[in-house]
UniProtKB/Swiss-Prot annotation:
Organism for this UniProt entry: Staphylococcus carnosus (strain TM300)
Protein name: Phospho-N-acetylmuramoyl-pentapeptide-transferase
Gene: mraY
GO BP annotation list: cell division; cell wall organization; peptidoglycan biosynthetic process; regulation of cell shape
EC numbers, comma separated: 2.7.8.13
Main location: membrane
Reaction catalyzed: UDP-N-acetyl-alpha-D-muramoyl-L-alanyl-gamma-D-glutamyl-L-lysyl-D-alanyl-D-alanine + di-trans,octa-cis-undecaprenyl phosphate = Mur2Ac(oyl-L-Ala-gamma-D-Glu-L-Lys-D-Ala-D-Ala)-di-trans,octa-cis-undecaprenyl diphosphate + UMP
A single MF term (Gene Ontology): metal ion binding
UniProt subcellular location: Cell membrane
Length: 321
């Protein structure tokens, strides 16, 4: 059944992308490129965006099929909720951007509040489905106060899901970069899931891998379509959710190492400039630094993929031990 689901996910995306591209062009849903970004990217202006819709539709359809034939639908329902929730936030953001014809979509506050809401609802659903197990609470020394660990864990879930959702979004700045790294991440978690005996999560990860492979064909340099926030916010949220459902959160630091590095480069760049007036990198996120250092786009993407694969294998080892 897994092989059938993989083929279905791949074919749906593969078929949908060439259908969506002319539709997006006709509706003038093209990407606006930041003027302060690398000048080599200006030629990408107008490239159709919101392509993440294709693999999200593929994932939703294929996961529903998996639910129909599954004895345990709860993991699929949780993952489907996160997929739709974060994907919807990205879709609204993309829609506002293409309508306004600039790179200002939802405000940061609006986006964060929506992401937090999805993360909190995920926690509640996980508790209802009895899929999250935690101790009674944490006692604060020298007091009679005890903080329920569920409160601590919900804060962690919010941080993890929202953080990685935005991390993948920051990484999605070069053709095929975020797509390829996400394929690697889901492949690692698919292997981990089956090794840990969590077949439902493993099957979902396989669906993710093949849905994204169908998209990568059109997203690799020179990209014919971008996934947009519709795709990137969803991917980050899903990857974090998978790590949580496998109780392998720490592994994500390695499996998602490039995403973490990209995010840290932005944080360090902003902090350094505010504190010292100097920049650490030529431009952030990190992939732009290497571009401005003379690397062509394909070299940056290839090296980052290789790094992602190596650290992903380390994360896999950590997750199963």
């Amino acid at each position: 059944m897994i092989y059938v689901l993989a083929i279905i996910a791949f074919l749906i995306t593969l078929i949908l992308v060439p259908i969506l591209i002319p539709t997006l062009k006709r509706m003038k849903f093209g990407q606006s490129i930041r003027e302060e970004g690398p000048q080599s990217h200006m030629k990408k202006t107008g490239t159709p965006t919101m392509g993440g819709l294709t693999f999200l539709i593929s994932i939703i359809i294929t996961t529903i099929i998996a639910i129909i034939f599954s004895d345990n639908a709860n993991p699929y329902i949780l993952l489907l909720f996160v997929t739709v929730g974060f994907g919807l936030i990205g879709f609204v953001d993309d829609y506002i951007i293409v309508v306004k014809k600039n790179n200002q979509g939802l405000t940061s506050k609006q986006k964060f509040l929506a992401q937090i809401a999805i993360a909190v609802i995920f926690f509640i659903l996980s508790d209802v489905f009895n899929m999250i197990h935690f101790a009674t609470g944490i006692h604060i020394p020298f007091t009679n106060v005890s903080i329920p660990l569920s409160v601590v864990y919900v804060v962690f879930i919010v941080f993890w899901q929202v953080g990685f959702s935005n991390a993948v979004n920051l990484t999605d700045g070069l053709d095929g970069l975020a797509t390829g790294l996400s394929i690697i991440a889901f492949a690692m978690y698919a292997i981990m899931s089956f090794m840990l005996g969590n077949n439902a999560v493993g099957t979902f990860c396989i669906i993710m891998v093949f849905a994204l492979l169908g998209f990568l064909i059109y997203n690799v340099n020179p990209a014919k379509v971008f996934m947009g926030d519709t795709g990137s916010l969803a991917l980050g949220g899903i990857i974090a959710t998978v790590s949580i459902m496998l109780n392998a959160e720490i592994s994500l630091i390695f499996i998602g190492f490039v995403f973490v590095a990209e995010t840290l480069s932005v944080i360090l760049q902003v902090a350094s400039f505010k504190l010292t007036g100097k920049r650490i990198f030529k431009m952030s996120p990190l992939h732009h630094h290497f571009e401005l250092s003379g690397w062509n786009e394909w070299k940056v993407v290839s090296v980052f993929w290789i790094v992602g694969l190596i650290t992903g294998l380390i994360g896999l080892w950590i997750g199963v031990h």
